[in-house]
UniProtKB/Swiss-Prot annotation:
Superkingdom, taxonomy of origin: Eukaryota
Protein's name in the database: Opsin-5
Coiled coil: none
InterPro entries per record: GPCR_opsins, GPCR_Rhodpsn, GPCR_Rhodpsn_7TM, Peropsin, Retinal_BS
Glycosylation site list: N4
Gene that encodes the chain: Opn5
């Protein structure tokens, strides 16, 4: 039975265009809800198994994880959290044609989606900044240790926790989305008060614009650096050139991850900003659900990029499941390879020792690639 708006305990906190109706009733047709439910089910299954597989393969070599790999695993944790903690709520609600978990469930769902989404974006920001420093500042990689990666993880989760908990303590709130079967940050508070505008603007800047700017800046600098150094690398022997090619490939994978995330979330951000500072009731309900569904698919992209785009990674995963040699897992590299960078840094001081170091490093990688036919195209 539909709820009467007078029975809602948080009626005064609702967006103005939801106060005269049941905010948890779906505004879509039954057919549209069923399509959305099946779509989210497929996305959730693929994301759960994909990111779970990444974590499983990582756990098999946890003693060998490097700092950048730790950050990539954290990204998989964020994506898995979105799929396991959040998606079931919306899927069930779509099939029930209304949000069935009440205000407590609405707040929980809104918090979880914001928490893991923010954690994912900040993790990608940290990875892009890390790669920028490693490639453009040679001395950075010398002192970077595992403990620094764990400190970075603590900062990421503290940052996400701070911004996502603010609405739960009175600065902002979580509310139903216009179509009724999902909940999100209450963007409409920006139209209610000056304090609401300040809060929404702060969220947009610190949780979207600033991280996106850092990502774009970092990869723009990386592209410029790779282009300027490619001619220099061509003069080295084939082993150093191979390391350079692999480094560029892994950087492209990272860029694809960030691009996929931003492509999925930017339409949703645009609609949210329009809801906060424009005329939210001017957006058709049927249209407002599309950016939401697109954003919810972001957690599925990364495993596909890992296992399809990076063929070497996928090959070594398959070899690991068949019980091949443990060293074949060395090709499970979701981080920027630093062979060229290190060799270039040492070359300026000790050319002979640099050549020996790089050759040994690359030959070691080649020997692992031969096990299980990893790296064959």
């Amino acid at each position: 039975m539909a709820l009467n708006h007078t029975a809602l305990p948080q009626d005064e906190r609702l967006p103005h265009y939801l106060r005269d109706e049941d905010p948890f009733a779906s505004k879509l047709s039954w057919e549209a809800d069923l399509v959305a439910g099946f779509y989210l089910t497929i996305i959730g299954i693929l994301s759960t198994f994909g990111n779970g597989y990444v974590l499983y393969m990582s756990s098999r070599r946890k003693k060998k994880l490097r700092p950048a790999e730790i950050m990539t695993i954290n990204l998989a944790v964020c994506d898995l959290g979105i799929s396991v903690v959040g998606k079931p709520f919306t899927i069930i609600s779509c099939f029930c044609h209304r949000w069935v978990f009440g205000w407590f469930g609405c707040r929980w769902y809104g918090w979880a989606g914001f928490f893991f989404g923010c954690g994912s974006l900040i993790t990608m920001t940290a990875v892009s900044l890390d790669r920028y420093l490693k490639i453009c500042y040679l001395s950075y990689g010398v002192w970077l240790k595992r403990k620094h990666a764990y400190i970075c993880l603590a900062v990421i989760w503290a940052y996400a926790s701070f911004w996502t908990t603010m609405p739960l303590v009175g600065l902002g709130d979580y509310a139903p989305e216009p179509f009724g079967t999902s909940c999100t940050l209450d963007w409409w508070l920006a139209q209610a008060s000056g304090g609401g505008q300040v809060f929404i603007l702060s969220i947009l800047f610190f949780c979207l614009l600033l991280p996106t700017a850092v990502i774009v800046f970092s990869y723009a600098k990386i592209i410029a650096k790779v282009k300027s150094s490619s001619k220099e690398v061509a003069h080295f022997d084939s082993r150093i050139h191979s390391s350079h090619v692999l480094e560029v490939k892994l950087t492209k994978v990272a860029m694809l991850i960030c691009a996929g995330f931003l492509i999925a979330w930017i339409p949703y951000a645009v609609v949210s900003v329009w809801s906060a500072f424009g005329r939210p009731d001017s957006i058709p309900i049927q249209l407002s659900v599309v950016p939401t569904l697109l954003a919810k698919s972001a957690a599925m992209y990364n495993p596909i990029i890992y296992q399809v785009i990076d063929y070497r990674f996928a090959c070594c995963q398959a070899g690991g499941l068949r019980g091949t040699k443990k060293k074949s897992l060395e090709d499970f590299r979701l981080h920027t390879v630093t062979a060229v960078r290190k060799s270039s840094a040492v070359l300026e001081i000790h050319p002979e020792s640099s050549s020996r170091f790089t050759s040994a490093h690359v030959m070691d990688g080649e020997s692992h690639s031969n096990d299980g036919d990893c790296g064959k195209k």
